[in-house]
């Protein structure tokens, strides 16, 4: 059986190396997020200030996988 995961929305606060970011969740928690394979494969650029959906494991709530970048009115895509 697959493990259950929580999905949160958050704001990218700082970019780290190798596709990792500090993400401030809507409940004010600060966690490390890494880019999922589909986002990496599609060359979707994630910058500080972007709103994202992040998938967090129930067992380790300090890290999460960024699964979606929410639309921003300033982007042209």
Curated annotation (Swiss-Prot):
Domain S1-like: residue ranges: 1-71
Keywords assigned by UniProt, alphabetized: Initiation factor, Plastid, Protein biosynthesis, RNA-binding, rRNA-binding
Pfam families assigned: eIF-1a (PF01176)
Entry-linked NCBIfam families: infA
GO molecular function, a single term: translation initiation factor activity
Spans through the membrane: none
PROSITE patterns in UniProt: S1_IF1_TYPE (PS50832)
Role description: One of the essential components for the initiation of protein synthesis. Stabilizes the binding of IF-2 and IF-3 on the 30S subunit to which N-formylmethionyl-tRNA(fMet) subsequently binds. Helps modulate mRNA selection, yielding the 30S pre-initiation complex (PIC). Upon addition of the 50S ribosomal subunit IF-1, IF-2 and IF-3 are released leaving the mature 70S translation initiation complex.
Superkingdom: Eukaryota
Subunit structure, as described in the record: Component of the 30S ribosomal translation pre-initiation complex which assembles on the 30S ribosome in the order IF-2 and IF-3, IF-1 and N-formylmethionyl-tRNA(fMet); mRNA recruitment can occur at any time during PIC assembly.
Gene of this entry: infA
Species in which this protein is naturally found: Epifagus virginiana (Beechdrops)
Similarity field: Belongs to the IF-1 family.
Localisation per UniProt entry: Plastid
GO CC aspect terms: cytosol; plastid
Protein name: Translation initiation factor IF-1, plastid
């Amino acid at each position: 059986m697959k493990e259950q995961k929580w999905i949160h929305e958050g704001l990218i606060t700082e970019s780290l190396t190798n596709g990792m970011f500090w993400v401030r969740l809507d409940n004010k928690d600060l966690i490390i997020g890494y880019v999922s394979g589909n986002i990496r494969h599609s060359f979707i650029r994630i910058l500080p200030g972007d709103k994202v959906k992040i998938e967090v494991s129930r067992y380790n709530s300090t890290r999460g996988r960024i699964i979606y970048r929410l639309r921003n009115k300033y982007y042209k895509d």
